[in-house]
Each structure stands twice: as C-alpha cells, then as structure tokens.
C-alpha cells in the first residue's frame, strides 16, 4: 500500500511535467528556426511616405526600408502600398524590407532583384507586373513569414530565381491563376533553400507555363503544383496535379536542406 501511494504522486508529477517539457521543446525549436534565418545585419533604417521609384540601379547599402504601417494580412493592396517600385529594366540590390509594409517590391517590367531580404512578408514580397514578356531575375536574398505567396508573377515572360532562401511560407512562386489578362510564364529556380512551407511553385500548364526546380527543401509539403489557370478574376483556379511532370521539372525528392 505504501509503495502504491508513493507511485501515484510520481505518476502525477511525470504526467504534469511531460506536456510542459514538450511545449518548451517545441518553443525552443521554433525559436531556433527563426534565429536560423540568415538575414544580414541591418546598417540603418529608412521609412518612405510613398513608394520609392527605382530607375536604373538602386543600392540600398543593406539598410532596412519600410512604410511605417501595419501589415493588413492577405487583403489585396496596390502600387501605392509598395516600398519600392522598380521601373522596366531597373535593378534593386542590397536592401532589407522591414515588417512595417504591405506590398513589398513591385516590378513594372524586366527587373533584377539582388540580395534583397524580407524580414516578414505581408500580402506578397515581390510582384512582377506589366504586360510585357520580360526577364525577371531574383539573385540571392530571402524571405520568411509569408502566409501565402512570396513571389507573384502577373506579367508574362520568365522568372529566374537563384540562391534564394525562404522559410515559413505558403508558396515561394505563383504564376497568377486568375488574372484578367493571362500570359505564358516560365520559371527557373536553382540553389533555393526552402523550409517549412506549403508549396514551392505553382504554375498553369494550360496557359503554357513551365517550371524547372533545383535546390533543397525541408518540411515543404508540395514542390510543384499545376493549376488550371483562368482569366476569370472571380474564380479560384482548380488544382490539376502535384509532383514531377513534363511542365514541373525536378528530381523527386529534392535534397533536404
């Protein structure tokens, strides 16, 4: 009887301790993941009252740039909400986009986004706009905390994404699924480091889209998803396929990061 009485408190102590220990371990793991995001140290900050328009080349000197506003989640914004608007042929490099913004960076046509980092993505990090068939390059840099898309491709042409780091995200790249004016789009991704995401790439093969993907991915549910794109802006595109195909080109599985 004495042994049984001793055993009960010990079991109760163990039962009470286990959830706490698991929770602490989970929080510690989450903090470690956040700390691992390799965003460079900021060399200052600047808040814009309106979008900064980039013609030619703009080097941000690794400062943090924002708009001094709170993120509005997945509520659709516009050009007026961007931190930078990059003109056709423009180059934006060496910048950190702060959390105090809504729309991040917009490209009006062909552009190069080099070594640009997003502290926390709001609606989208980077949007390719316009009506042309240009080349959109993303070289280095990274983003985290996107509830949905990191890179939204609305215009036509190609996207080249090299050595980009993305963590805790919905989609790294999405070819617009229901834009009123649709285009054929291609995306080439190499050297990507992706972790804790839902979908790496989403394309619309019925509109001529294709994707080539190489890099590493950890805890990413789907690497490449094919949709039936539409020009009906009020309709969500249907998911058609997930995995390697003639239009989703990658070796399954991708290496773990």
UniProtKB/Swiss-Prot annotation:
State its Enzyme Commission number(s).
Answer: 4.2.2.2
Chief location category:
secreted
Out of the domains of life, which is the source?
Eukaryota
Q: InterPro entries from the xrefs? A: Pectate_lyase_PlyH/PlyE-like (IPR004898), Pectin_lyas_fold (IPR012334), Pectin_lyase_fold/virulence (IPR011050)
Query: What does the entry's cofactor note say about binding and number?
Result: Binds 1 Ca(2+) ion per subunit.
Which Gene Ontology BP annotations are present? cell wall organization; pectin catabolic process
GO MF annotations for this entry? pectate lyase activity
Keywords, comma-separated and alphabetical: Calcium, Carbohydrate metabolism, Cell wall biogenesis/degradation, Lyase, Polysaccharide degradation, Secreted, Signal
Which cofactors, if any, are listed as required? Ca(2+)
Q: Please state what class of enzyme this protein is.
A: lyase
One Pfam family matching this protein: Pectate_lyase
According to UniProt, the reaction catalysed is: Eliminative cleavage of (1->4)-alpha-D-galacturonan to give oligosaccharides with 4-deoxy-alpha-D-galact-4-enuronosyl groups at their non-reducing ends
| Record localization | Secreted
GO annotation, cellular component aspect: extracellular region
Family from the record: Belongs to the polysaccharide lyase 3 family.
The record describes the protein's role as: Pectinolytic enzyme consist of four classes of enzymes: pectin lyase, polygalacturonase, pectin methylesterase and rhamnogalacturonase. Among pectinolytic enzymes, pectin lyase is the most important in depolymerization of pectin, since it cleaves internal glycosidic bonds of highly methylated pectins. Favors pectate, the anion, over pectin, the methyl ester.
> What is the official name of this protein in its record?
Probable pectate lyase E
Gene source species: Aspergillus oryzae (strain ATCC 42149 / RIB 40) (Yellow koji mold)
